């Protein structure tokens, strides 16, 4: 619960949930489809302008965080996050809700971003919603390296695999 300096109680988490649910209901009644787009995408610097143009033209999210990053040096063990070693990339971070009057399948905009990222040789952080097919996911995130770590640190398979957690959200 939040309190102001006087100690008087203000909005609670329950109030926030009610406002959110009312907003969703209003959108449904108005036939507005919404999709949360929360992503961190790393694109090689040579293709960064193309990705930014795509975000503006095809996605329309604002604001966009733009930050240069350098991948680990060649020979460094970091195969689960597949940026080309020693290269400079641009990280694009964006958090917004995209609205449309056209009915869309779940994850439509996020999937469009994933396809563009892959086409430009980029990689996406997996903390956000992901919609990759399983074969595509493992072609990007090195199943062999992941399985080697899994065999060593979770040989009994107590915890789910990366695809199940990140894409299927189980």
Where are these regions (language model features)?
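C-terminal substrate-recognition/cap domain of FAD-linked oxidoreductases
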Residues: 1-109
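Activity-critical C-terminal alpha-helical subdomain
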Residues: 24, 105-111, 115-170
